[in-house]
Regions:
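Long, low-complexity, charged/polar intrinsically disordered regions in eukaryotic proteins
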Residues: 1-31
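Long, charge-rich, low-complexity alpha-helical segments
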Residues: 33-93
Length: 93
């Protein structure tokens, strides 16, 4: 399911990012972990319940300004949907 643009993604209970000084940055989930870098890290760091999906898209598009904006948006929406399916994210309206 595609996340709504006005929703606020946040890490699901039991999920967290490892400390910033620990490399590689990792999304820790119950009984598994996902290494993050580049765009995936930029996205997950903003999933704090304070940024809307739309705000995350705009901020990441600024970072990757040479990429086609529509492609960046679709990639972000797809990644957020994947993390939701994996129960790593919750969304609030």
């Amino acid at each position: 399911m595609t996340p709504e643009l006005n929703s606020f993604p946040r890490l699901a209970p039991g999920c967290r990012l490892n400390e910033k000084n620990q490399q590689p940055r990792t999304l820790l989930m119950p009984e598994r972990a996902l290494r993050l870098n580049g765009p995936s890290l930029e996205i997950v760091e903003r999933c704090d319940g304070q940024h809307t999906v739309q705000q995350i898209i705009v901020e990441v598009q600024k970072i990757y300004s040479k990429a086609e904006p529509h492609k960046v948006e679709q990639d972000i929406l797809g990644y957020l949907a994947l993390l939701q399916k994996e129960r790593a994210l919750d969304f609030a309206l």
